[in-house]
Regions:
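Anion-binding alpha/beta catalytic cores of soluble intermediary-metabolism enzymes, centered on
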Residues: 1-206, 211-276
Length: 276
């Protein structure tokens, strides 16, 4: 609720609170926030799934430009989002991307997918890249540099991530993502350090200058994302992509900066997102 108040005060978005009115009022009072300052759309019951469905209805109708998870569980919101007939599915697979500001990296760095797709196969990785590259372009990255991350830099038939990386690079060469530089497989060290790539004798346009890292699976992505935050001192904004509207999935441990940055990113993505 404090994040909602900050978002409104800073003019980033016009918050619409969705749920049972009494629950919203009590949450606002506990946070010291005047709920009357916001538009409230009441759901029919205290069941969080009713609030999720109402939010999806508003998004389908074009009455809201983005969704942000409040006090309900992620699966309660996402079940409504991915509903086959009444959800927010669009042309591509739904995925997630973080955009990081890291103290020791020279520019913003995106990671995908660290939240939604557990063990993506090749077609899923293609869609994850499609969504994340589109997000980068809304941020002004005209020619994204993408590293497909694996444990090793060479294609190894025993490591599926390296085979997928090789296939994605070949797909990029057909123009699948337009003017984007896609390289892989890259070890994480090579992807973020030109010096590491030089020592290993690699020639790369991406090493040390990546805009986006495609992680091999959710385990690797989620651990790297949390390492960036809790050890690396990074701040991040994250979005669910590939739905009709961008979706902010907050965690209880997220910083206020991360929450506000995610909403700002959602507004940018929404403005640059083609109509469904």
């Amino acid at each position: 609720m404090l994040a909602v108040a900050r978002i409104a005060a800073e003019g980033l978005a016009r918050p619409v609170l969705i749920g049972e009115a009494g629950v919203i009022a009590r949450a606002a009072e506990a946070a010291g926030v005047d709920a009357r300052a916001f538009e409230i759309v009441a759901s029919e019951s205290t069941d969080p799934r009713a609030a999720a469905q109402r939010a999806v209805e508003l998004a389908r109708a074009g009455d809201v430009d983005a969704l942000m998870k409040g006090s309900l569980h992620t699966d309660e919101l996402m079940s409504a989002v991915i509903h086959k007939s009444h959800g927010l599915r669009a042309a591509t697979r739904i995925s997630h991307a973080f955009v990081f500001d890291l103290p020791r990296y020279p520019k913003l760095l995106a990671l995908a997918d660290c939240v939604v797709n557990i063990a993506p196969h090749l077609p899923a990785k293609r869609d994850i890249l499609t969504n994340a590259i589109a997000l980068l372009r809304t941020l002004g990255v005209v020619r994204p540099k993408v590293g497909i991350v694996a444990a090793v830099e060479t294609v190894n038939p025993a490591i599926q991530a390296t085979l997928d990386a090789d296939s994605l690079v070949a797909l990029a060469q057909t123009g699948e993502w337009g003017d984007a530089i896609v390289e892989g497989p890259l070890g994480f060290d090579n992807a973020v350090s030109a010096e590491a790539a030089r020592i290993k004798g690699m020639r790369s346009q991406v090493a040390g200058d990546a805009d986006l890292l495609l992680m091999p699976d959710l385990n690797a992505g989620n651990m790297l994302y949390k390492s960036f935050v809790y050890i690396g001192g990074g701040e991040c904004a994250g979005l669910v992509l590939g739905a009709r509207v961008p979706i902010v999935l907050t965690s209880r441990a997220d910083s206020m900066t991360s929450r506000i940055a995610s909403v700002a990113l959602a507004m940018i993505a929404s403005a640059g997102q083609p109509a469904s």
